[in-house]
Amino acid sequence: MLLPKRTKFRKMHRGRLKGVATRANTVVFGEFGIQALEPVWLTSRQIEATRRSITRYVRRTGKIWIRVFPDRSVTERAAESRMGAGKGAVSYWVAVVKPGTVLFEINGLSEEMSHQVLKSASYKLPIKTKIISRESGN
């Protein structure tokens, strides 16, 4: 599971998911990547499940880059607790993803195999995605 070693503040405001990604929206490290088409909070569990799905196929022949990191804490209250008494405890960590963000990149596989691997990995994600290549430029 991914989570920060330490943060300046443990608990954070929720914020809003508006606009599109102006950074991290092109394939930089690998040849092919998964690009988000919707805004979402990706949990560390979802990122890990997707990483495992890709690793199953890539093994030693290729390389994986995870372009998102869950650095935002999400708090939850106990199920039957009364209102007030402060903010709840940190429950899990999320990465804020805007439309256009490249989530994962791979290299070292054929184009056909890469598409197959990334398509199967995208089923682990709770959003619509598209597979992009370095040449396509988008």
UniProtKB/Swiss-Prot annotation:
Gene3D superfamilies: Ribosomal protein L10e/L16. One of its GO terms (cellular component) is mitochondrial large ribosomal subunit. Belongs to the universal ribosomal protein uL16 family. Pfam families: Ribosomal_L16 (PF00252). One of its GO terms (molecular function) is rRNA binding. CDD domains: Ribosomal_L16_L10e. Part of the 50S ribosomal subunit. It comes from Emiliania huxleyi (Coccolithophore). It comes from the Eukaryota. HAMAP family: Ribosomal_uL16. Keywords: Chloroplast, Plastid, Ribonucleoprotein, Ribosomal protein. This is Large ribosomal subunit protein uL16c. The keyword Cytoplasm does not apply.
